[in-house]
């Protein structure tokens, strides 16, 4: 879904979002789209131009709003007509877990907000570092999407919810990308 340009500009002017796309002020943020809510939107998606997530009511029902509120700040989604969506909620992570990659991964620190800008490469070689995993059934990924345990994955598959991609991520004791120094300098959330 396409985020409204004036809304994105306002988020930047109010120092809620950095030019790099990082959310600086972690709080509930309402999403304003420049289009109507469509059936073609994925059940777990993002307002384009931001890292603000959107969850469809079917995912919300499956995960439970109280569980979602444990790991996300929850807001509303408005369409181009400024009508609140009954289909989607907005979500801003309270914390992030980085999916890691190999030595080809890119890592830098945003000069403006100090966030780690990391992209795991090569594709399809991703993993999670053991010590970064919280004791939760699901939690936000710093890349995109939601990391879930096996039990939640079974529920998602059984639910029949369409248009959800998933991949089993190995859990490694240590990162193999050579970027630990980048992650040692993480700013507080």
Go through each PLM region and give its residues.
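Phosphate/anion-contacting hairpin/loop surfaces
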Residues: 1-189
């Amino acid at each position: 879904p396409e985020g409204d340009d004036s809304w994105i500009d306002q988020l930047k002017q109010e120092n809620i979002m950095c030019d790099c796309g990082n959310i600086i002020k972690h709080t509930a943020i309402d999403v304003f789209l420049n289009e109507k809510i469509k059936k073609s939107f994925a059940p777990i998606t993002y307002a384009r131009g931001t890292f603000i997530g959107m969850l469809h009511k079917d995912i919300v029902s499956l995960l439970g709003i109280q569980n979602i509120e444990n790991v996300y700040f929850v807001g509303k989604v408005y369409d181009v007509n400024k009508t609140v969506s009954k289909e989607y909620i907005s979500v801003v992570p309270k914390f992030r877990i980085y999916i890691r990659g190999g030595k080809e991964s890119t890592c830098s620190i945003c000069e403006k907000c100090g966030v780690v800008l990391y992209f795991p490469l090569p594709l399809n070689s991703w993993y999670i570092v053991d010590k970064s995993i919280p004791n939760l059934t699901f939690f936000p990924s710093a890349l995109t999407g939601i990391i879930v345990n096996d039990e939640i994955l079974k529920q998602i598959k059984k639910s029949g919810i369409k248009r959800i991609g998933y991949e089993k991520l190995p859990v490694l004791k240590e990162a193999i990308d050579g970027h630990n120094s980048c992650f040692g300098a993480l700013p507080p959330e």
